[in-house]
């Protein structure tokens, strides 16, 4: 069967352009999810001039998305509409609510499964399109989580500089407190920052680390109790959590079964050896491995797998591929 990958446009264009209009739709559906869920019925929407959703008939040619109580957001645009791929990609994250939250992980890796060289050089494994994609995920999510290694290596700002959208709460995991407070994420005022470490390492009365709030959670020997952390973030109103990296951090969330979706951007690059993308305890047989349902999108020269970790391919009957692979190579 001849198959195609959907191209997700990323260039910042004018307000009337397909990609920009599609992103305005994505932001609007993310804002409207809680209200749509409370209605508990199917409702179709279009994008109004104020960039907010307006209810509309399902069969109206201007209908763009619809809320389905059993599924969340679905896109109503025809398959050949150049806005559809971008909207489709983000709808599972936009469907999150306080009752049904979502945690999504992301890694950009080489063809042979590495996120950096052995020295830690990682800028950039994937192309600029994937960088914009990460900024989009930040804009959609209430919190972005990174490990100490990512902060030490990349000194990221973790803001939404490249796209319209609000900055998320920045969460830095540093179990053993090896970071200094001179990194940008602890010094700028781009957004609130939570500096998370083992509770026993928090000094009595200590509240700030640079400009960040110090937050202690239970230690687990070689890390942090991530279930406790997720519970604390949910209590702060974080329905959408984005685990941006690096490989160790995403792997620990994956091993703890705390990721609902995983975005893997694979670049046409061979590193040979270096820092691995994902490392989990070794399985005995392939039958023990998780083969999730997935969709495939193209971003410039990279290929993005959007994996639904709460579903498996063998959960779906044979011949039902359209439900599991929206963009097929």
Feature locations, PLM:
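Enzymes that bind and transform nitrogen-containing heteroaromatic metabolites
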Residues: 1-329
């Amino acid at each position: 069967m001849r198959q195609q990958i959907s191209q997700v446009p990323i260039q910042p264009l004018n307000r009337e352009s397909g990609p920009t209009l599609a992103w305005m739709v994505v932001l609007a559906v993310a804002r409207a999810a809680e209200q749509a869920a409370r209605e508990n019925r199917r409702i179709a929407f279009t994008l109004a001039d104020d960039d907010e959703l307006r209810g509309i008939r399902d069969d109206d040619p201007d209908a763009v998305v619809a809320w389905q109580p059993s599924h969340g957001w679905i896109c109503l645009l025809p398959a050949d509409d150049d806005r559809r791929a971008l909207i489709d990609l983000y709808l599972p994250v936009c469907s999150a609510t306080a009752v049904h939250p979502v945690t999504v992980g992301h890694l950009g890796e080489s063809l042979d499964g590495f996120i950096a060289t052995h020295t830690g050089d990682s800028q950039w494994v994937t192309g600029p399109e994937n960088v914009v994609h990460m900024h989009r995920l930040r804009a959609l999510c209430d919190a972005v989580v990174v490990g100490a290694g990512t902060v030490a290596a990349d000194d990221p700002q973790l803001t939404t500089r490249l796209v319209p959208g609000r900055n998320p709460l920045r969460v830095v995991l540093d179990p053993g407190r090896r970071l200094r407070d001179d990194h940008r994420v602890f010094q700028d005022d781009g957004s609130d920052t939570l500096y998370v470490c083992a509770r026993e390492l928090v000094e009595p009365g200590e509240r700030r680390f640079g400009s960040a709030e110090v937050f202690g959670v239970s230690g687990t020997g070689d890390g942090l109790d991530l279930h406790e952390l997720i519970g604390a973030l949910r209590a702060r109103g974080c329905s959408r959590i984005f685990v941006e990296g690096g490989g160790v951090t995403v792997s620990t969330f994956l091993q703890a079964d705390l990721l609902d979706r995983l975005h893997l951007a694979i670049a046409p690059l061979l590193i040979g050896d270096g820092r691995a993308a994902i490392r989990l305890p070794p399985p005995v047989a392939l039958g023990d491995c998780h083969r999730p349902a997935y969709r495939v999108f193209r971003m410039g020269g990279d290929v993005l797998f959007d994996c639904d970790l709460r579903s498996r391919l063998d959960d779906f009957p044979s011949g039902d591929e359209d439900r599991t692979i929206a963009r097929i190579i």
